[in-house]
């Protein structure tokens, strides 16, 4: 890793104790064998120490993948193509970029019309962007678990490998990943930690970082406050502006609040039509100025 080479980890059965608490948890990508026992403290040790069995179903590959602790579950017979796909993204040389398409004219629209358009449930999001615009995609742990509102992936765009960190919007169609339910489009501490993992991954593999902004705003709850939401926003900003690898931010839709601002200060910032950025949603600004939300369109 110090030499910026990819470290891929495959956890077999069992993978516990010091192995899981050292190199087994330090890979750039970590997958496990189906049904593998994975955890820090083995269940027999726990039962002997505490006089009761460890809760069933916790220390399994499938459960840890659902919670985003590992990146996925891969059968032995599927390991070779999985590794090949991952290494194609992170280790192959960049290809020649394709010729750029001629720019299309952008029709001016009132700001509120753009806000309304960005909230349409059928508007393409980061999932659509990965499927339509990228090749050799490898989805990592951000597609599941507590950080499910942030998508983390390795992909190639026009032959150029990159790490993708994208805020996952709620839709039932274009933007939903196969095999997963749509996540709430509010960004909490775990989602920002996943974004920071993407930044570290880009730095460790010396790959460009693409950040896709599309969020209705931060999770506003006791859990978010106690989980250090403000601190995670600050650390995202700090990590991003000090990153040594090329960075591009894409305002794909809504760009509301601290979680959006935390992903903006890249080397290049692009905006899709109807993409917008604000420290809080228009309804919030209306509440501050007029003490109601009826003036949001103004």
Predicted regions and their residues:
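Aromatic-residue hotspot detector
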Residues: 40, 57-58, 127, 133-137, ...
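General structural signal for secondary-structure boundaries
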Residues: 110, 125, 185-188, 281-282, ...
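General structural feature for long, well-ordered alpha-helical segments within catalytic domains
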Residues: 60, 75, 79-82, 111-113, ...
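Intrinsically disordered, low-complexity segments enriched in small/flexible residues
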Residues: 80-173, 180-184
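Conserved catalytic cores of soluble enzyme domains
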Residues: 1-92, 213-298
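Cleft-lining beta-strand/loop regions that shape enzyme active-site pockets
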Residues: 1, 8, 153-156, 160-241, ...
């Amino acid at each position: 890793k110090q030499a910026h080479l990819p470290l891929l980890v495959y956890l077999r059965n069992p993978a516990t104790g010091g192995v899981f608490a050292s190199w087994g948890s330090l890979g750039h990508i970590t997958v496990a064998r189906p049904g593998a026992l994975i955890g820090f403290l083995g269940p027999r040790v726990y039962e002997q120490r505490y006089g009761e069995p460890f809760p069933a179903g916790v220390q399994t590959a499938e459960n840890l993948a659902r919670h985003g602790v590992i990146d996925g579950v891969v059968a032995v017979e599927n390991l070779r193509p999985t590794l090949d796909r991952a290494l194609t993204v992170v280790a192959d040389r960049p290809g020649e970029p394709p010729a750029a398409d001629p720019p299309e004219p952008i029709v001016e629209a009132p700001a509120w019309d753009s806000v309304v358009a960005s909230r349409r449930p059928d508007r393409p999001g980061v999932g659509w962007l990965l499927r339509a615009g990228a090749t050799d995609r490898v989805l990592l742990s951000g597609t599941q678990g507590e950080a499910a509102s942030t998508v983390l992936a390795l992909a190639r765009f026009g032959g150029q490998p990159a790490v993708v960190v994208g805020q996952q919007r709620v839709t039932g169609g274009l933007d939903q990943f196969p095999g997963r339910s749509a996540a709430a489009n509010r960004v909490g501490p775990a989602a920002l930690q996943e974004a920071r993992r993407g930044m570290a991954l880009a730095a460790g593999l010396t790959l460009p970082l693409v950040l896709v902004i599309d969020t209705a705003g931060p999770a506003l709850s006791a859990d978010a406050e106690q989980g250090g939401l403000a601190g995670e926003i600050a650390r995202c900003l700090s990590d991003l502006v000090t990153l040594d690898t090329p960075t591009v931010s894409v305002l794909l839709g809504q760009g509301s609040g601290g979680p959006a601002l935390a992903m903006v200060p890249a080397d290049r910032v692009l905006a899709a039509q109807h993409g917008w950025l604000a420290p809080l949603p228009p309804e919030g600004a209306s509440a501050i100025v007029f003490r109601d939300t009826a003036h949001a369109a103004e």
